[in-house]
UniProtKB/Swiss-Prot annotation:
The active site is at residue 363. It comes from the Bacteria. InterPro entries: Bifunctional_GlmU, GlmU-like, GlmU_C_LbH, Hexapep, Hexapep_transf_CS, MobA-like_NTP_Trfase, Nucleotide-diphossugar_trans, Trimer_LpxA-like_sf. Binds 1 Mg(2+) ion per subunit. It comes from Pectobacterium atrosepticum (strain SCRI 1043 / ATCC BAA-672). Residues 251-456 are annotated as: N-acetyltransferase. This is Bifunctional protein GlmU.
Length: 456
């Protein structure tokens, strides 16, 4: 039965020694964000009023990474078991709220399963998430009498008969705050590990005549924990395949779903096609009929209808209107904006640059801190020299400007509409409308020139 309020406790104090890392285990990333952030997000989605994060190892790193002001930080100075961790959080529990216990290293738990668990919790009893395994070795076993859950016995404390049980405890449970505080106060560490087990409260509830309702998750991967990098990589692939399947069913054509990574949120139009080894990060919005070539990385971008990103291009924090073409091997850095029909070709880099309607930068150019009008042609090898060693400066180019190859525009500088800049020119002063600017050294011809001979 639901209480009107619910708080969540996330256990995240483990050292993660098997990760062989200076980073706390729960900060290792899955799909681009820390494992524990996945758990926090699931908790928030269930409508939790408070999230208590129990931490120990690497507290400063955790607080630096997890900046949500809604988190209540609870220190577990010594790691003496799950029951001990919950005892540290217990002073924050209200009597009339549900307390949901989660783990920072179980990143794929879904909000749907948590809602189901909460709805199944009996009045005065416990909702418990369990699964059945073909090989339950190492896990706490669910002990039943006449079908009812009466206790959990850890593997090291289990008898041979109990070790034959294949229903295991996932560690995720929910109980009323008042009841939970009472049970936590009665825990002891009389077991093989010398730890305080949260699982002992199951027997306490049963002894009081309270019902324990076992619920199963939709997928086994939801309750799989991470103790080493091999397990983390396995969950990463499970997660990515799930995201790929959702996109395929929603109409996105992934040419090889096994070679696609989504590390954020993707919204899309119809008939989107993505080739192999595409990585999508942050918040990305793709319009209708967008094509993404092999090996591209797209982060926090909006890409308009009928645009095409050719292979091995990297786009970050950029906005592209309809019918833009990018790459191959192009880079759009944060602040890049392309109007309809703009083209950025191979080995061209943009940073805080706006390219107007139909403008083109086809080859080997750097355009930084630039505002470029419509119908502009940027020749190969053009550079906006935006940095003077101390400060950045802006280049402004009007409409219908032709910039010849190997041009340097030394900012701050303005090139008015209709101007033409000859190849090899270094522009240091403003250019007026329809002017031709050329600063090359006059070409000389020397007949009969003898090359130097190499000395032996």
């Amino acid at each position: 039965m639901l209480n009107s309020a619910m708080s969540v406790v996330i256990l995240a104090a483990g050292k993660g020694t098997r990760m062989y890392s200076d980073l706390p285990k729960v900060l290792h990333k899955l799909a681009g964000k820390p494992m524990v952030q996945h758990v926090i997000d699931a908790a928030m989605t269930t409508g939790a009023q408070h999230v208590h994060l129990v931490y120990g190892h690497g507290g400063d790193l955790l607080k630096h990474e997890l900046t949500d002001p809604a988190l209540n930080w609870v220190l577990q100075a010594e790691q003496l078991g799950t029951g001990h961790a919950m005892q540290q959080a217990a002073p924050h529990f209200a009597d009339d709220e549900d307390i949901l216990m989660l783990y920072g290293d179980v990143p794929l738990i879904s909000s749907q399963t948590l809602v189901h668990l909460r709805e199944a919790k009996p009045q005065g009893g416990i909702g418990l998430l369990t699964v059945k395994l073909d090989d339950p070795a190492g896990y706490g076993r669910i002990v039943r009498e006449k079908g009812a859950v009466v206790g959990i016995v850890e593997h090291k404390d289990a008898s041979e008969a109990q070790r034959q049980i294949n229903e295991i405890n996932t560690g995720i449970l929910i109980a009323n705050g008042k009841d939970l505080k009472r049970w936590l106060s009665q825990l002891n560490n009389n077991n093989a590990q010398g730890e305080f087990y949260i699982t002992d409260i199951i027997a306490m509830a049963s002894a009081e005549g309270q019902r324990v309702e076992a619920v199963h998750p939709e997928r086994l991967s939801e309750v799989e924990g991470v103790n080493n990098r091999l397990q983390l990589s396995a969950l990463e692939r499970i997660y990515q395949r799930e995201q790929a399947d959702k996109l395929l069913l929603a109409g996105v054509m992934l040419l090889d779903p096994a070679r696609f990574d989504l590390r954020g949120e993707l919204t899309h139009g119809r008939d989107v096609v993505m080739d192999v080894n595409v990585v999508v990060e942050g918040n990305v919005k793709l319009g209708n009929r967008v094509k993404i070539g092999a090996g591209c990385v797209i982060k926090n971008c909006i890409i308009g209808d009928d645009s095409e990103i050719s292979p091995y291009s990297v786009l970050e924090d950029s906005v592209l209107e309809a019918q833009c073409t990018i790459g191959p091997f192009a880079r759009l850095r944060p602040g890049s904006e392309l109007a309809e029909g703009a083209h950025v070709g191979n080995f061209v880099e943009l940073k805080k640059a706006r390219l107007g309607k139909g403008s083109k930068a086809g080859h080997l150019s750097y355009l930084g801190d630039a505002d470029i009008g419509s119908g502009v042609n940027i020749g190969a090898g053009t550079i906006t020299c935006n940095y003077d060693g101390a400060n950045k400066h802006k280049t402004v180019i009007g409409d219908d400007v032709f910039v010849g190859s190997d041009t340097q525009l030394v900012a701050p500088v303005n090139v008015a509409s209709g101007a033409t800049i000859g190849a090899g020119t270094t522009v240091t002063r403003d250019v007026a409308e329809n002017e031709l600017v050329i600063s090359r050294v006059k070409q000389r011809h020397i007949s009969g020139w003898q090359r130097p001979v190499k000395k032996k």
